[in-house]
Amino acid sequence: MKVIVIGATGSIGRLTVKNLLAEGHSVTAFARRPDRVGIEHSELTLRAGDARDAAAVTAAIRGQDAVVITLGAGASRRNKIRSEGTLAVIRAMQETGVRRLIVQSTLG
């Protein structure tokens, strides 16, 4: 399965990428600084972009089978990356026809 991980440079994102690769999936790691993923694998594609950038998210999601969102705001409670990024991803999925979504969140 082709899976994109949005927010792939955080601890949960990197672990998600590693586990998906170990299970035999083809993974795209999407992050502002994908060089920070720190994983090399023949089935891993690194893609730079901001989760709030609708055009970048849509382009990255096109052709994927599933999306995993592991966005985090870090220590800043004012950062709206989770809400704005998740909304951009959902809209991109609607536009591209990708139907599988997993969202990791610490909100609750």
Question: Can you describe what each PLM-predicted range is?
Answer:
Residues 2, 26-27, 99-100:
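Residues at the starts of beta-strands that form the adenosine-phosphate
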Residues 42-65:
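Conserved Rossmann-fold cofactor-binding substructure of NAD(P)-dependent oxidoreductases
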